Amino acid sequence: MCWLRAWGQILLPVFLSLFLIQLLISFSENGFIHSPRNNQKPRDGNEEECAVKKSCQLCTEDKKCVWCSEEKACKKYCFPYFGCRFSSIYWLNCKVDMFGIMMLLLIAVLITGFVWYCCAYHFYLQDLNRNRVYFYGRRETVPIHDRSATVYDE
C-alpha cells in the first residue's frame, strides 16, 4: 500500500495542474467578463504602439505585445486576458505559442518536483538503513544501537 500512496502523491499535483491549465484555456477561449471600475481611464499609449505593428516578428520584439494569429493583430500583453484563444497567442517568438510555453513550464516544474522527490526518498532510505545491519545467517535486518551516545551513570 505504500507504493500506492507514493504514486498518489506524485499524480495528484499532476492532475491538479492539468486541471488548472485546462480551466485557464477554457476561460481564454470563451472570454472573460470585464467590468472596469472606472471607464474614464486615460488610454495607455502601449495599446496604440502594439496595434501599429502588422507582423508577428515586429510584434514579438516588444515584450509588452502579443501576436494573435487568429485575428492577425498585435495586442497589448495583459495576462490572463489576451482577447483571443490561448493556443493562438505568440509572445517573444513566432514559433511556440503561449500554450506550448505553459506546457514546457509545467513539464519543467514536474521534472524538478520529481527529481526533488527522488532525492528526498533516497536520503530517507539512506537514513533508515544507517541504523540497521543485515545478518546473512539469519536473513533479516536487525537494528543496531547507537554507540556514539554516551550514558552517564552517577
Swiss-Prot record:
Record key words, sorted:
Membrane, Signal, Transmembrane, Transmembrane helix
- Transmembrane segments annotated in the record for this chain: 98-118
Cytoplasmic side residue ranges read: 119-154
Principal subcellular localisation of the protein: membrane
Sequence ranges on the Extracellular membrane side: 27-97
Q: What start and end residues bound the annotated signal peptide?
A: 1-26
- What is the protein's membrane topology class? Single-pass type I membrane protein
Q: Which InterPro entries match?
A: PTTG1IP
Location of the protein in the cell:
Membrane
Q: Name one GO cellular component term.
A: membrane
Name of the featured protein: PTTG1IP family member 2
Organism the protein comes from: Homo sapiens
